[in-house]
Amino acid sequence: MNVSSFLLAIDSGNTAIKWGLHTGDQWLVRGSALQSERMVLKQAWALLPAPPASVLISNVAGLQAADDLTALLKPWYVQPHWITASASQCGVTSRYTKPEQLGCDRWAALIAAWYRVQRACLVVDVGTAMTVDTLSSTGEFLGGIIVPGPDAMKQALAGCAGTLAAPVSSCFQNFPVNTENALYSGMIQALSGALERMYRLLSSYSEKQTLTEVIMTGGGAALLAQHIHIPHRIVDSLVLEGLAIIAKSGNFDYNKK
């Protein structure tokens, strides 16, 4: 095992930070922390079996999160690389009008998904927001949608309707018979409906497109997966996988936060 090639990959999302130490072939250790508890990372990283030789970061949580991560990385004297989306990378090409404006987490997830399946698929990240992105059978990112995730929907309802916030005990019903279940079921229907509609759209995009599954990731993936009726798999830490693939390709040079 060549410790001089260890990569620390960091996925700094809106709510949580996921990280992993990669050997070039496999994950040696992985962990996570809430954005509100970033200093927990200092303790976790102090226990790493070896210092990273490189650091690759996907950050969508803003400049303060970037500054805090930079400070936490200083003891290793390693210059972190902050990825951005591009027109083409690691076999994936982008149709985005301005490719660099695509969220770097979405881009890393697309690269990981393409590396896994090499065919047309949906890449679904269920977090603070839910993104549903489309990949063609040739690795072309056709575009995608962004909708509020489960927690964001709950908070929005609580903010505008106070007592209408769905309690934890709410459950899904096809035909809800109380207000709490109506709110919860509506949230599930909205998210699963958006996902399944995108599935149908990609399926009809071209006769040559063959969808075999949906690749799901994010904190809300397991919840939503219970309510969709299309082939799918859940991949934990898909963004980290994408970062490891990008790092291994050597096709990056992003030092700006």
UniProtKB/Swiss-Prot annotation:
A monovalent cation. Ammonium or potassium. K(+) binds at D125. It catalyses: (R)-pantothenate + ATP = (R)-4'-phosphopantothenate + ADP + H(+). Keywords: ATP-binding, Coenzyme A biosynthesis, Cytoplasm, Kinase, Metal-binding, Nucleotide-binding, Potassium, Transferase. One of its GO terms (cellular component) is cytoplasm. One of its GO terms (molecular function) is ATP binding. Its main location: cytoplasm. Its EC number is 2.7.1.33. Substrate binds at Y96, G103, C104, D105, R106, T179. GO terms for biological process: coenzyme A biosynthetic process. ATP binds at D11, S12, G13, N14, T15, A16, I17, K18, T128. Its cofactor is NH4(+); K(+). InterPro entries: ATPase_NBD (IPR043129), Type_III_PanK (IPR004619). Belongs to the type III pantothenate kinase family. Homodimer. HAMAP family: Pantothen_kinase_3. This is Type III pantothenate kinase. The lineage of its organism: Bacteria, Pseudomonadati, Pseudomonadota, Betaproteobacteria, Nitrosomonadales. The gene is coaX.
